[in-house]
């Protein structure tokens, strides 16, 4: 069995050869299109001020993945706080064990990084995103959706820029881990750009502002004809809902599924087949 990091190391070694061919990578199985959100490759090394598109393509090619939901940090310049060598631990706030609180200096630095990212998003031309898409196309990888987490610190200009990014990448779908209040702000931009936004849910159904319950998804769908659901069947099961029933009743509003196996009652992630929900029933 190979870990995500093992795949990354193999991909970096095999990348130039595998990227030399542009034939479409077929990662479908029995007619079901399988792919990945590129957040799954968050352990790849980062360099300050640089994207990691080339390393990501090498990893995807090594894994024979031909369909992706492109995670925004992969195509954005990495902040200094996210930089790590290949052998380091996870970046972007993914930590093992307890973390010490940030110092005032670290808080100030991260605030400056956040503002720099905002300005980069607003000012970067469409040609940059078109060039990124061309790299994936040349590698035989289809960009199905763009993943951008609309957080409360987004300005309206930054929200608008997010839709321009998606269009530059040639996609009409943004997948977003966001909140109900933010979805209300985002929906008018979805109407303006005619780009779909699929909200991603978690297992926290106690917070009325979070997506996770069928009722919360219904509220999103009512905001705009462009709002959709990106159903994570693991989180949905952990929140004690029936993923199979929801898919059957709402499939026309679901753009894609995130597949993981979890136990009910906010249980742990499990190896495929060991959780509460029978995964195969969700795509039959």
Where are these regions (language model features)?
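Active-site-adjacent beta->alpha loops and helix N-cap segments on the catalytic face
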Residues: 179-189
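Acidic/histidine-rich catalytic cores of soluble enzymes
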Residues: 31, 36, 190-276
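Conserved phosphate-coordination/catalytic loops
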Residues: 47-51, 123-126, 153, 177, ...
């Amino acid at each position: 069995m190979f870990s995500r990091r093992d795949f990354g190391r193999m991909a970096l070694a095999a990348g130039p050869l595998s990227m030399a061919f542009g034939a479409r990578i077929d990662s479908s199985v029995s007619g079901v299109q399988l792919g990945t959100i590129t957040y799954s490759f968050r352990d790849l090394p980062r360099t300050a001020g640089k994207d990691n598109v080339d390393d990501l393509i090498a990893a995807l090619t090594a894994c024979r993945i031909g369909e992706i939901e492109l995670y925004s940090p992969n195509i954005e310049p990495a902040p200094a706080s996210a930089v790590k060598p290949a052998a380091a631990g996870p970046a972007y706030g993914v930590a093992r064990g307890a973390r010490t609180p940030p110092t005032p200096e670290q808080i100030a630095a991260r605030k400056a990084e956040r503002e720099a990212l905002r300005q980069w998003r607003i000012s970067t031309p469409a040609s940059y995103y078109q060039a990124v898409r061309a790299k994936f196309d040349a590698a035989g990888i289809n960009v199905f959706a763009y993943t951008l987490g609309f957080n409360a610190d987004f300005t309206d200009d930054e929200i608008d820029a997010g839709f321009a990014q998606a269009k530059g990448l040639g996609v009409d779908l943004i997948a977003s881990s966001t909140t109900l209040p933010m979805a209300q702000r985002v929906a008018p931009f979805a109407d303006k750009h005619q780009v779909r936004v699929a909200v991603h849910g978690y297992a926290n159904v106690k917070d009325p502002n979070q997506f996770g319950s069928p009722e919360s998804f219904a509220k999103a769908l009512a905001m705009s004809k462009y709002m959709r659901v990106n159903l994570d069947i693991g989180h949905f099961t952990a929140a004690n809902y029936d993923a199979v029933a929801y898919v059957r009743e709402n499939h026309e509003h679901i753009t894609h599924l995130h597949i993981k196996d979890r136990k009910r009652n906010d249980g742990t992630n499990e190896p495929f087949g060991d959780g509460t929900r029978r995964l195969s029933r969700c795509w039959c």
